[in-house]
C-alpha cells in the first residue's frame, strides 16, 4: 500500500513561512498574465463536473453562483456516507488504485492537535466542521488535465 490519500498532516505548532525565492516570484509574475484564462478553464470544468456528477445521490456538489466569479482552487465534494457505497476514505483509496489522486477537502481546525490542546477542544465541538473534515473530498481539477481525464474521473465515480 502507498500513502493514504485521506491523510492530511497535523500541525503541532503555529507558524508562518511566507518566503518566496526570486525564481518563484518570476514564475508568479508570468502566471498572473494567464490567470483569467486559468480561472475560466477551471470554471468550465467545474460546471462539467456539476453536470456529469449530479446523478450521484451520495455526492453533494459545490454550488455555482453566477453572481460572482470564483477561482476554483479545488473542486470539493461532500460524500454522504449514509448513501454512499463505501466510506469517503475507502472511495479515495479505490480512486487512487485507478490512478485518480484525491485529497480531503479541508481541515477542521478544531481537530488539529495544536488548537485542540491550546483551546481544550473536542472533535465533536463543531459538528459541521467535523463533517467537512471527515467527508469532504477534493477531486482533480487543474489546467494540465484534458477532456479525457475529466471523463475518466466521472466514469470511475459513477462506477462506484
Give names to the regions the model predicted.
Residues 1-5, 48, 52-53, 90-125, ...:
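Conserved PLP cofactor-binding pocket of PLP-dependent enzymes
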Residues 25-30, 51, 77, 93, ...:
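Generic alpha-helical structural context detector
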Residues 34, 82-85:
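Short helix-loop capping/hinge motifs at secondary-structure junctions, enriched
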Residues 38, 86-91, 149-152:
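Short amphipathic alpha-helical coupling segments at ligand-binding clamshell hinges
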Residues 63-65, 73-83, 111-119, 134-147:
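Conserved PLP-binding active-site segment of the aspartate aminotransferase-like
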Residues 147-160:
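A short beta-strand-loop micro-motif that forms or neighbors metal/cofactor-
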